[in-house]
């Protein structure tokens, strides 16, 4: 028998909404930061690269926090923590790994962006801002894989 759809309890709806909203904000912030940083790659004025850094701080970081809080909320409400690690589905592991490692990479990108913005005031920092934008693009690819895993739920 093939499962066409699965239902979950309505008590989890708000937690899932918070998780998905945070993920959408995070991905939107990463798209904006990556595109602005890559378009402004050769910009001598650093304007787009600074906008990219600001987007990481103001959009992507809060989105990551909301996404992670929502994920933990769903995890506890669905009682996934009661299962042995062997029985937890692959998509859940993909989500945790991408969120945790992605959070570390996001923090590295934020530190580089912050130092780059500070140095940009005195005429430098372009390489740090470019690296921050490149990390945002890498994170975007990683989180697209996570969105696929969460949506498609392979095994």
Predicted segments with their positions:
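Polytopic transmembrane helical bundles with strong interfacial aromatic enrichment
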Residues: 2-155
